[in-house]
Amino acid sequence: MNIAPSLAGLAAVSLAVAPDARAQEIAPRSEEPGAHADEDAHEEEEGEENVVQGTRSRRRIQDEPIRVELVTREEIEEKLLMRPGNIAMLVNEIGGIRVQVTSPALGAANIRIQGMEGRYTQLLADGLPLYGGQSPALGLLQIPPTDLGQVEVIKGAASALYGPSALGGVINLVSRRPGDEAEAEMLLNATTRGGGDLTGYLATPLGSGWSASVTGGAHRQDADDLDGDGWLDIAAHRRWTIRPRLFWRSESGASLYATVGAMTEDRTGGTRPGRTVPDGSFFPQTQATDRLDAGLAAEMPAGGIGTLHLRASHSVQDHRHLFGDVREDDRHATSFAEASVAGRSDATIWVAGAAFQRDLFRSETFPAFDFSYRAPALFGQIEHDLRPNLTLAASARVDFHSEYGTQFSPRLSALYKPGFWTIRASAGRGFYAPTPFVDEIEAAGLSRLEPLSGIEAETARNASLDIGYARGPFEGSVTVFASTIEGAARLETVSPTRVRLVNADGPTRIAGSELLLRYRRDGFTVTGSYVFVDASELGEGAGAPRRQVPLVPRHSAGLVAMWEEHGRGRIGLEVYRTGRQPLEDNPYRTESRPYSHVGLLGEIVLGKVSLFANAENILNVRQTRDDPLLLPARAPDGRWTVDVWAPTEGFVLNGGLRLRFGGH
């Protein structure tokens, strides 16, 4: 697909600091015990409510038995000024979530929730798998936050809600809805590392319940070899995106949402022109991506039963890879459809439905890895208020997977709100349908992988307990969680140039806790967070002892201070500390160094125009200051680099302007 010209035209038309994720803001804002828990300060000030889209029950966030963390539009705007081109920074600074770089050559990354592998995280857009059922590692870097209204995060096994791709959790990107007046925004950004972004958003009511929006963007990044070793520490890319949306709502409560999206990107990394890797060969690494998708969601009253919900989507991604002298061309496609009926009484909410998803992969170069997974499913969910402050919830799903058989995924949750306290407990089970694309293969390609044989589904059990308290300007929460993963897929070395994918012999065990403290007063917000994760697995080989899971820091913490006044501007300071991480197959060290990340953001609003500047990684932490990225010899899986455990781009300064027109 050559979609660049059409994207350029559509983008031209569309263009005519830290997200301290509201972890269900764990307790009442009111000074009266028994008031609704978790109410957001901005909801009170503006008279708005945050309704969760990702759990099907459509409750207010404070009434959800399942813990849902929320990043609001205000917090999204802070991150939009820091990194307009993608959502990596937005989700990376949510407690318990880590964006892990999986390919130093191209900068690809995935989302790890509470120490679990990134492939277990389901990324949705308005509840639809528009970025694929099993999101590729580069997908995270290709989604701009321009038109996001909120981000919902469900941690832990969520297969009972969304099937096999949600073993570790769900991140649902909810788009902005047009208001009563037409509005438009344009943002121009440039960085000291040769990056640039131009994004635009246009939304307007159309009358008779109809409204529409369109988002477009052009993004660029120049390549850079910061340490002069001939290997590009920052990959180059050129990307265009466009996404129109159509909305309709009737007075009867029926609604319709439709969207199409397109993206094209060329990304270049590996060796610089004329430079070589240690064996004397050139090793350029490139990836060209074209993505097209479409999605539809509708709901309508179903007689006296309840509400009928219909959802469907289809996405296609074509890739053209180059790994040194090996070219790999492939296509990923995901088709999804779901129908459900939801009803409610005074104390009970129920949902029942059926779903179907097909995930397809076709490789022109290595057809032995082609697959087509088909998974029809039945699911149900019920929530019951035993008392005004006590709610129980149960959900279950049965997937009839074409490759991995029948899989049952249950989840139980409870919510108790005694006075200013909020207590949530949850436990669930889920599964994941393995594919060849573990992190190492995403980074190095399929050329050295043995054809898959005898792989079984990966399964996990998960439990969590959340206790929170809030009163006046203070709030805090403590979360403890534990997961056990059976049959985790990982690579095993067969020879110096071949690897195979196998299920781990023993369980991967993860346990940890999250702590959040926040203070708000007169436009000032100070948030402190701490995360502890203990993740262990069996080592490779017969009789190997247990070891810590690589690239999972046991300790990480953050402190964010932000002042904002609408119509004037904002200023924010963020400090994050990442502890030591176990490393694997790294000849330079077995454990990473701890490091600190400091950022400073400022914005001045001058009517319809705002000017902003952001300093990121002020301490100029860079992994290549300690060790090379390049390996002395190529790894059996085909990689030429060690794993990334610290920033690779060093200090970056970005700034620009934002224009707003119309709206309220």
Question: Where are the model-predicted features located?
Answer:
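Gram-negative outer-membrane beta-barrel transporters
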Residues: 385-392, 480-485, 504-585, 656-663
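Non-catalytic regulatory/gating segments with a bias toward low-complexity or hydrophobic composition
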Residues: 91, 151-152, 171-173
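Structural signature of Gram-negative outer-membrane beta-barrels, strongest in the C-terminal barrel
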Residues: 249, 259-261, 298, 347-351, ...
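Outer-membrane beta-barrel signature, preferentially recognizing the C-terminal barrel domain
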Residues: 275-302, 422, 426-486, 493-520, ...
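Short acidic/polar hinge/loop motifs at secondary-structure boundaries
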Residues: 110-112, 128-155
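Short, acidic, small-residue-rich periplasmic hinge/interaction motif at the N-terminus
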Residues: 25-78, 118
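Periplasmic-side early beta-strands and strand-to-turn transitions of outer-membrane beta-barrels
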Residues: 159-160, 172, 180-181, 187-189, ...
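C-terminal beta-signal and adjacent terminal beta-strands/loops
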Residues: 486, 577-582, 603-664
